[in-house]
């Protein structure tokens, strides 16, 4: 990111993202704004449990999640649609409030999923067909491409800067 120019640095207010944002800010000199809309999806009763514990205690919830119903609200948590709407509300606010600004966001895999679906116009019920990588770099640009103003994914989950130090691949 040393060579990337941006105007604003916004991070999820959760610890892992704030720590990553602090490393970026140290190199770039930016101050860090936080926004809770960049938080990962709230998994309610499933938070902090292993997959074995979820299968044992909440198999009904797991079945509902596996059905990919975007409106299913996890007990004590939120639905995929609620999470998506929260993420995209911030993107739309940034776009209208800071036109032309280059914004660096430090977030979580589920937020990347929301952005990918938004840009690619993928329905929320469709299972993921892509991987998100921790500590990776994604570049999404809004501009005129082939005569149409739209969002374009320029770089997706680039982790070349992690070569040689190990990587943690995951789905969210």
Where in this protein do the model-derived segments appear?
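Glycine-rich phosphate-binding loop signature in dinucleotide/nucleotide-binding domains
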Residues: 1-5, 94-101
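Phosphate-coordination/substrate-recognition cap region in phosphate-metabolizing enzymes
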Residues: 1-63
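Amphipathic, non-transmembrane alpha-helical scaffold segments
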Residues: 14, 55, 80, 84-88
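Active-site signature of alpha/beta-hydrolase-fold catalytic machinery across serine-
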Residues: 23, 114-118
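Acidic, low-complexity terminal tails and accessory targeting/binding regions
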Residues: 41-53, 96, 101, 117-172
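Short glycine/proline- and acidic residue-enriched helix-loop micro-motifs
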Residues: 61-82
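Generic beta-sheet signal
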Residues: 101-107
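GST superfamily/GST-like fold recognition
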Residues: 109-113, 136
């Amino acid at each position: 990111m040393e060579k990337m120019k941006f105007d604003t640095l916004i991070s999820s207010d959760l610890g892992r993202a704030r720590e990553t944002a602090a490393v970026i800010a140290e190199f770039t000199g930016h101050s860090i704004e936080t926004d809770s809309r960049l938080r990962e999806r709230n998994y309610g009763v499933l938070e902090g449990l292993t997959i074995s514990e979820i299968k044992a205690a909440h198999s009904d919830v797991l079945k509902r999640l596996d059905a990919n119903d975007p409106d299913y609200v996890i007990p004590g948590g939120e639905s995929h649609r609620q999470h998506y709407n929260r993420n995209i509300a911030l993107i739309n606010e940034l776009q209208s409030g800071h036109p032309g600004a280059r914004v660096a966001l430090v977030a979580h895999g589920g937020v990347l999923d929301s952005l990918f679906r938004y840009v690619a116009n993928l329905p929320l019920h469709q299972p993921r067909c892509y991987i998100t990588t921790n500590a990776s770099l994604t570049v999404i640009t809004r501009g005129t491409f082939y005569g149409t103003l739209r969002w374009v994914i320029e770089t997706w989950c680039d982790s070349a800067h992690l070569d040689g130090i190990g990587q943690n691949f995951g789905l969210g």
